[in-house]
């Protein structure tokens, strides 16, 4: 979901890290089936070792499904909204490299997060690459190695 400024006025968080535990987001249920291209990305991520996938709930209504969450253990990898927008929870170095290479936009409401849309078939490969980079980062791969995968 592409955030609207008015929607997020009270949680403007660009100067802090957002660390949200899966259990704080609402009832833990299997992820929903998404539209065609976002679903292809979701299915790929769910195959990866130690990934926890669950329903992503609406920020303001914990009974309204809003997409699919992905965690590596207790660390958030990112989530895909029902409309195909992805919010990816990266760190400073990785987000800067992603933004520099124009692979995503800066998520305006959380430091070091990036966002992008999965709207067409060509977006699937890029989305999987970005989720994979973040997955590898959370698994301890050195930042220089990750950045070299972007600068191919």
Task: Outline where the language-model segments fall.
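Charge-dense, helix-prone N-terminal extensions
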Residues: 2-152
